[in-house]
Amino acid sequence: MGLSDIPANYMQQTGHNLQQQQLHHHHHHNHNHNHNAAAAAAAAAHVLAMENSELLMSPKDKMSSKKKMHLLKKIKKRFGLVRRSPSSCPGPNNLPPLQFHTVHGDNIRISRDGTLARRFESFCRAITFSARPVRINERICVKFAEISNNWNGGIRFGFTSNDPASLEGALPKYACPDLTNRPGFWAKALHEQYCEKDNILYYYVNNAGDVIYGINNEEKGVILSGIDTRGLLWTVIDIYGNCTGIEFLDARIYMYQQQQQQQQQQQQQLQQQQLPQQQLPQQQQQLPQQQLTAHHPLQQSRRSLPGGTGVVVDHELERHVMPSLQSLHLAGTAAGIIEHDLANGLPPLRYNANGRLIPVPFHITKGRNVRLSHDRFVASRTESDFCQGYVFTARPIRIGEKLIVQVLKTEQMYVGALALGLTSCNPALLQPNDLPNDSDFLLDRPEYWVVSKDIAAAPQRGDEIAFFVAPNGEVSISKNNGPAVVVMHVDQSLQLWAFLDVYGSTQSLRMFRQQLPNMVAYPSQPQINAAAAAAAAAASTTAASSRMLPMAESLNSLNAGQMLRSKMQLNVTQSSSTLASTAGNGSRMISMPSNGDILQIQPNGGGTVLVVNLPPRSSSHDLNGQLAGRQAASAATVTSSGILAGACSSGTLISTTSSQQYIEPVAQSTSTLNGTKWKDSLSDQQSTDSSAECTICYENPIDSVLYMCGHMCMCYDCAIEQWRGVGGGQCPLCRAVIRDVIRTYTT
């Protein structure tokens, strides 16, 4: 097809040549801008007036006004009043076709009137330029004419503000990074998967300096930014790797062909819609309505409002509210999640479908190469990059909470896989520049970071990786419901956010969580009366077993450094069903698994997570708490974070620095363990901790601090040996890499 085959109304008419347009643009920019704005406003008003008058015409007048409306359409296109289709050229189409410049690499041969460039001998020294400067928003179409399987990699393309004529005899081997390290050159590598024979690459630079590219008329997004558009720009292409020949296409012809194909497809779809509905299967007619009702039960009622008002849909409401309603609607049953996945083309959960699964949204803080879905449930890395795929959980994780990561898409061309990490850093405080390309460098940050790379070897689409943090700090991972493997240890007393690095072969994923068995919420500063609590406990003994504990000594935070006493009591009852209560503002979540061995306090507003191993219960427990009162003083233990947690044979006392409250687990009627053994083991542990002996040699006192984790568990000599390679140079408690050893002195 040539330019003569394109209708005249497709071309934009111009009365000046290219040089006159550029000269006029540079010297009379402001005048033309104001003149065009006024002309566009006048034309728009005239068009609207004629369209309104057409509605009042008779049928004969309408037939005679077709020519006028045809003229109006031309005016609309001329002044930009018609919305362009994605395939239409966004820039001027009255420019001559692009050709290759005579200045090029040593291994380049130009033919076909300067439109075809081939690379001979080797894989480098193949830099080419356009023969003329390109305009802003001018679409450049490149066809991959020849492909070789003897090389790897894809072409490099971009722009330069340097005249190629000034580079004759001074071209380097490669465009990236030889040219891009010089001022005035911008280029990026195209992914090798797009470099296939007869594929057509298009790209252009806009006024903001962003380079948008696409393949086969399908836009992929921005690949380059920061182009200086104040001067002339030439396109630069390095025919590198598996591509050995490229051809410049006339953008006008290519875009016209794409428009014709789209029009034909639209006509075919319109003809199919006009077929009698009796010929369509009944299931096919009912399927869209069933899907609409199943996935968005509120959407149908909003669209079917009387008076036609339901036709206008608030897109922002659908964009933000409907995904949340949908997740709430589907969170209760696994069948609802499977139905939703099948409707959206996502692989259903196969290995962890049992139980109550809740989709987990990702935090808005992410790596620069990650795209989140509108509901933030799906994270996808851009196809042209393999790193900077960080995503964080929107809230801190809870101890014992099972998180399930499902792989939605993979790309086997990349090496490496998904990485998992935990951090005490709030993602809201991070900037995109704070995240490195290699997740190992996160360990150099001042916050607490732990990372494990390649947690799933060679992941496939549909694989499910489940992980959770145990009360002892072990992080266990299982793939496809297989045996769990401990991959790292963390400081479980910290408030931790989980993060993933969508790296290497992993392209897209989403996350679910299984709700903990029992959740109790209580206000941060409750008003509790001892007499009222005792009366309430006596009244509730017939329904559930309960008990109260008196006051115990507690230490304030290390910053205050003084002893406080409190006589506040909190009565916690346990029934056979799941415990749940409504909390007000500033509430905290208490997680109590059904076995009653672990108690976890999760502050919603931030702070330290307190995890307590509950003591065994005895059937001869005193409900009045007299035994607890006698043993409370000897059972108190001060934690390193400044929070007091006491445990004894009769119960557990918990005190926080903010509210100074006591949380007590409920006694069970039967127990297979002996409370005396718990008391003895606790006393032994306290005596061991008080001696502060090195955990390696058990001879010298602890006199060193490990940097960066901050643990004090070894003497200085053992810490130096551990740091220099014995044990892998890791902290024996949290397995963090030891960066330095700091010696401490006591007086």
Swiss-Prot record:
Question: What keywords sit in the KW lines?
Answer: Developmental protein, Differentiation, DNA-binding, Metal-binding, Neurogenesis, Nucleus, Repeat, Zinc, Zinc-finger
InterPro entries the record matches: B30.2/SPRY_sf (IPR043136), Neuralized (IPR037962), NHR_dom (IPR006573), Znf_RING (IPR001841), Znf_RING/FYVE/PHD (IPR013083)
The job of this chain, per UniProt, is described as: Involved in neurogenesis. Interacts with other neurogenic proteins in the specification of the neuroblast versus epidermoblast cell fate.
Which parts of the sequence are annotated with region: Disordered? 280-309
Q: Please, one GO biological process term?
A: mesoderm development
Q: Does the keyword Nucleotide-binding apply?
A: no
Q: Which ranges carry the NHR domain?
A: 97-251, 359-514
Name recorded for this polypeptide: Protein neuralized
- Molecular function terms in GO for this entry? DNA binding; phosphatidylinositol phosphate binding; ubiquitin protein ligase activity; ubiquitin-protein transferase activity; zinc ion binding
Q: Tell me where in or outside the cell this protein is found.
A: Nucleus
Primary location class: nucleus
Q: Which CDD domains match?
A: mRING-HC-C3HC5_NEU1 (cd16647)
In its keyword annotation, does this UniProt entry include GTP-binding? no
Q: Where are the zinc fingers (RING-type)?
A: 694-735
Question: Which SMART domains did the record assign?
Answer: NEUZ, RING
Q: Where is the composition biased (Low complexity)?
A: 280-292
List cellular component terms (GO). Answer: endosome; nucleus; perinuclear region of cytoplasm; plasma membrane
